[in-house]
Regions:
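Gram-negative bacterial Sec-dependent N-terminal signal peptides
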Residues: 1-13
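Predominantly soluble domains enriched in secretory-pathway, periplasmic, or organellar proteins
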Residues: 11-375
């Protein structure tokens, strides 16, 4: 549910859609906000200014993967996971959920909740193949990856791949050719390679240690590199890291010391630039004495031959969550859970500058966002 002040705008002829999941149950002690429905918002990133064009109530979660939304390449539907649900016995501590929902985007101004099915508990990252025929969901609490076939905007369970106890997959991502996928296991600190043959998904047996608390990943458009985050760092350094993996050999190409809590990693649509969302130890509540001292960070790197070189950075907000690029890589959007906003930045290849005209308020806490070109 959006803030009352937000007016839904008509959709332009060249809509560039982003789908954002918003969590209405994440409450903090002492705040005045109250429980509200989870929701999914549809934004037009091509509009000037960027605006919300539609919304629908649907299960969603802020605590969990920022890759909890996947949008079909033709922008006709989206899939949204919910890692948590409201806990009536203890409203300040939601419990694990297993929901996976399909959102119809045929009329973006009037999105519809078509279906909600179950994966495993703590349903986190979701990935959709480019053909839009198979979806994979990481079930963190179960240590498994669930597969669903997709036809006519409907999910049908197609089995699961068990990674094992103590793996806790937080994310999963398809390679561009759809024949492989990679599970990102938080507890194991590993990538697990999966083979995809139609609707049959199996482990290849190839694994790679990337770092502590491996969280999320994205693959370059040519399928060569996988870029992933490690909240607990790599090796002796416990600072959050970003690793680049060569998928030809499943070996580490480089490790970059990124900063505190790399929450989300995302590629520009041309695959040249890598943006990293850093929560950076910023406060989650305005009552925190550190509220005005520490904020989140955006860092943008150029990817060259498997290595990352920082080219720009900017301060962001508090409790930073998911992010998205626009189609031509000139705008970056950041979800701010504490402020309950989505904010925008302009990127020219060398600088990243806040555009205060792009500030969209939400009633629920934004938690995940994706476009058709996100992954």
């Amino acid at each position: 549910m959006m803030a009352a002040a937000m007016v839904l705008a008509p959709l332009g002829a060249r809509a560039e859609l982003a789908v954002a999941a918003n969590d209405g149950k994440q409450l903090l002690a002492g705040e005045t906000a109250h429980l509200m429905p989870d929701s999914v918002a549809v934004l037009d990133l091509a509009a000037s200014p960027v605006r919300v064009v539609g919304r629908v109530n649907a299960p969603a979660s802020m605590i969990g993967s920022p890759n909890a939304v996947a949008v079909a390449r033709d922008q006709s539907f989206a899939i949204v996971t919910a890692a948590q649900k409201h806990n009536p016995a203890d409203p300040l501590n939601p419990v694990s959920d297993d929901k996976v929902s399909v959102i119809d985007l045929a009329d973006p101004a009037n999105p519809k909740l078509l279906q909600t099915v179950k994966a495993g508990p703590n349903a986190a990252g979701v990935t959709l193949n480019r053909a839009g025929t198979l979806a994979l969901v990481a079930a963190r609490d179960e240590g498994a990856i669930y597969a669903f076939t997709v036809a006519n905007k409907k999910l049908t369970a197609a089995g699961k791949v068990t990674l094992g106890k103590g793996t806790a997959p937080a994310d999963v991502v398809f390679a561009p050719d759809g024949r492989h996928a990679y599970a990102v296991a938080w507890d194991a600190g590993k990538l697990f390679e999966l083979s995809v043959d139609g609707a049959r998904v199996t482990r290849t047996g190839r694994e790679l240690v990337t770092g502590r608390s491996a969280y999320g990943a994205v693959v370059t458009p040519d399928g060569r590199w996988l870029i992933s985050t490690n909240v607990g760092g790599t090796g002796a350094d416990q600072t959050g890291s970003v690793t680049v993996t060569d998928l030809r050999t499943l070996t580490l190409a480089s490790v970059t010391r990124a900063g505190k809590t790399p929450e989300h990693v995302l590629l520009s649509p041309d695959g040249r630039h890598v943006a990293v969302v850093l929560a950076n130890g910023a406060a989650t509540s305005r009552t925190d004495p550190a509220w005005n001292r520490v904020v989140g960070l955006f860092k943008v790197y150029v990817l060259e031959n498997g290595r990352l070189k920082e080219v720009a950075r900017a301060d962001t907000c508090h409790w930073a969550q998911g992010a998205a690029w626009n189609a031509n890589g000139t705008l970056l959007f950041q979800q701010c859970a504490a402020e309950r906003e989505l904010i925008g930045f302009r990127f020219d290849g060398k600088t990243l500058v806040r555009d205060k005209a792009i500030t969209l308020p939400f009633a629920a806490r934004p938690g995940a966002i994706a476009t058709a070109h996100s992954r």
